[in-house]
From Swiss-Prot:
UniProt enzyme class: oxidoreductase
Membrane-protein topology: Peripheral membrane protein
Lineage: Bacteria, Pseudomonadati, Campylobacterota, Epsilonproteobacteria, Campylobacterales
Entry-linked Pfam families: DAO
Binding locations of FAD: G9, G10, G11, I12, V13, G14
Protein name: D-amino acid dehydrogenase
pH dependence: Optimum pH is 8.
SUPFAM superfamilies to which the protein is assigned, alphabetical: FAD/NAD(P)-binding domain
Required co-factors: FAD
Length: 410
């Protein structure tokens, strides 16, 4: 039997696509190779950080990263080798680190950040139950130079709240005297990504969306300019529309004769319990070492580190130890009780712009990947964009694709 819409990938982007397609009245089937219980979306920091925050590739990032490498505090770790794509990625990353590109990207972040926030509100109205707080993102600065640089960008719009080192401790009780101060970006929010994923899965299942868990897509059957069949290790599935949202895994993208400039960036998190009085009052980011610390219902999560050009899916204990060491330099001693360590791969483009839109060869294939560390931030917005695109029928008819897709960005 031919299915109307097949979404390949059960992460936040895939589920968001299924959610918005269902809202338009489509019959949707989600195919996910795992049991859907612990993918990369679950290990996310949970930041909805679209507002007044620069992308990874921004002016000064290259020099700052080199300085942090010397201190072993750099957020990016490159495993250099014979992979040509890595060097192409680095070159594009460096070229994107300019004021013009950053200004445009931040404007797009705001546009699609508000769309995501609206959709999170709708999900809650739909009866989903997940930890969601609109209480800002606290940017904590440990270098006077970067703190002063940030202060110059702050205006009196209400989107910023400048805090001294002493005032910062009211929001982050565990920081020590090695910090310079902080800026609360008031428009940002945070969620518990695991709760979002479970709530979204439950809602979609109850709404009649079909889920094929533990079923891996291994190939496609092509006929002329269409994908005639989706081949899993169990069966062949036909579909009118196929949405490919497989995150950092490039295997199926390559099956469609594409090779996007996107790297699987290995990220780490540690989730633990700590005394309530010591927990951060809102989501926080140690800006100079790119380490997020996010309060949740019963736990706290720290996330950091992005390793490029590695396929090793095991947790690197040295990286975990390095995260703890970097955090300890700016906090008072505290115990991470019942700590759970995690790592996973994020689909990272060099300029934080995702690959969205219809495939150039196959007319019933839509791509939705490349959000990197911003999956929770923009996943709901991407789902809405893709659903609208399916109605428009062509990339050029959809303004959001033209604005926010790497297919149309130099």
């Amino acid at each position: 039997m031919k299915k109307e819409v097949v979404v390949i990938g059960g992460g936040i982007v895939g589920l968001s696509c299924a959610y918005s397609m269902h809202k338009l009245g489509h019959k949707v089937c989600v195919i996910e190779k795992s049991d859907g219980a612990n993918g990369t979306s679950f290990g996310n920091a949970g930041l909805i950080s679209a507002f007044k925050k620069a992308p990874l590739s921004c002016p000064g990032v290259v020099l700052d990263t080199l300085k942090l490498m010397l201190k072993n505090q750099a957020p990016l770790k490159f495993h250099f080798g014979l992979n040509l794509k890595l060097y192409q990625w680095i070159l594009k990353f460096v070229k994107s680190a300019n004021a013009k590109s950053t200004h445009r990207t931040m404007a797009l972040f705001e546009r699609y950040g508000w769309l995501s926030v609206d959709i999170y509100h709708q999900m809650l109205k739909d009866g989903m139950d997940f930890w969601y707080k609109e209480d800002g993102l606290l940017m904590i600065y440990t270098l006077e130079e970067s703190f002063e640089k940030k202060l110059k960008t702050c205006d009196d719009s209400g989107a910023y709240k400048i805090l001294s080192a002493k005032e910062t401790k009211e929001y982050m009780p565990i920081v020590n005297d090695n910090i310079c101060g902080s800026v609360l970006l008031t428009e940002n929010a945070h969620v518990d990504p695991g709760e979002v994923m479970h709530s979204l899965q439950e809602y979609l299942q109850n709404a009649g969306v079909e889920f094929l868990y533990n079923e891996e897509v291994i190939d496609f059957e092509f006929k002329n300019n269409l994908i005639e069949g989706v081949i899993t290790h169990k069966e062949k599935i036909q579909a009118e529309t196929i949405i490919l949202a497989t995150g950092a895994n490039p295997t199926l993208i390559k099956k469609t004769k594409n090779d996007f400039l996107m790297m699987g960036a290995k990220g780490y998190s540690i989730t633990f319990k700590m005394p309530e009085e010591l927990k951060p009052k809102t989501s926080s980011l140690f800006a100079d070492i790119f380490m997020a610390m996010t309060p949740r219902r019963d736990t706290v999560r720290i996330t950091s580190k992005l390793e490029l050009n590695t396929n090793n899916a095991l947790i690197d204990k040295e990286q975990i130890a390095n995260m703890k060491k970097n955090l300890a330099a700016f906090t008072q001693p505290f115990e991470m009780k019942d700590a759970i360590e995690w790592c996973g791969f994020r689909p990272l483009t060099p300029n934080d712009i995702p690959y969205l839109g219809y495939d150039k060869r196959y007319k019933n294939l839509i791509h939705a990947t490349g959000l990197g560390w911003l999956g929770i931030t923009f996943g709901p917005a991407i789902g809405k964009i893709i659903a609208n695109l399916s109605q428009d029928g062509a990339n050029e008819k959809n303004a959001d694709i033209m604005l926010f897709s790497a297919f149309f960005r130099d």
